[in-house]
Design a protein with these regions (language model features):
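Sec-dependent signal peptide recognition
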Residues: 2-8
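Cleavable N-terminal signal peptides
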Residues: 8-9, 19
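N-terminal signal peptide c-region/cleavage motif recognized by signal peptidases
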Residues: 14-18
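N-terminal secretory-pathway/extracellular module detecting exported/lumenal segments
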Residues: 21-90, 97-190
Length: 190
């Protein structure tokens, strides 16, 4: 009888525990999380900063019609400062058009002009990156995994992703690399 009560208590406990919470230790040690970006907030301090981890197990292809691809995945923004220590979970959907990858732009410009200027290539790559993204806030946690209240303002409009936005561009490229084992800008469409 006591054994049945204990088993029932364990089952109830298992179903009432939050399963999606994430801790800083899990982000730092689990192989499914890839550190994509690090930025020190204050170079004079030994700790603290902005860290972005990509959950490589969460990435899924939502559209596959080469040269267009769409991927959806989850990433975590870790903010560690003296006044704030949080983990923000976000879902990112990125549309990729490899007609605008850097390698394709170089290849097509060489086909049209055997000696393209570097300036023309830079202007072409900055005018359109071939990436568009949608970002949705999912949750906010403390470093030990406790859920924090969060104000959700989710704008589901797609907006172009510029190569100068290195943080988001690196996340999008890491997602592409995780699924297709090559960088987005290395693909040549002929």
């Amino acid at each position: 009888m006591v054994q049945r009560i204990l088993m029932l208590a364990l089952v109830l406990l298992a179903f009432t525990m939050p399963t999606e919470a994430i801790t800083l230790q899990e982000l730092q040690t689990s192989p499914q999380f890839k550190l994509v970006h690090v930025q020190a907030m204050n170079p004079t301090m030994e700790r603290g900063g902005l860290y972005i981890y990509l959950n490589t197990y969460s990435i899924e292809a939502t559209h596959y019609a080469p040269p267009q691809y769409s991927l959806r995945g989850t990433y975590y923004v870790v903010i560690d400062t003296d006044y704030q220590s949080t983990i923000e979970e976000k879902q990112l959907t990125v549309d990729y058009d490899t007609n605008y990858s850097l390698a394709t732009l170089i290849h097509s410009s060489r086909m049209m002009n055997p000696s393209p200027s570097t300036l023309a290539l830079i202007e072409a790559s900055e005018s359109k990156s071939g990436l568009a993204m949608t970002e949705v806030d999912v949750a906010k946690y403390t470093f030990d995994g406790a859920t924090k209240p969060m104000h959700y303002v989710n704008d589901t409009r797609k907006f172009p992703l510029n190569r100068n936005n290195t943080i988001m561009y690196d996340i999008a490229d890491a997602m592409f690399m995780s699924v297709y084992q090559q960088h987005f800008d290395d693909i040549v469409v002929q």
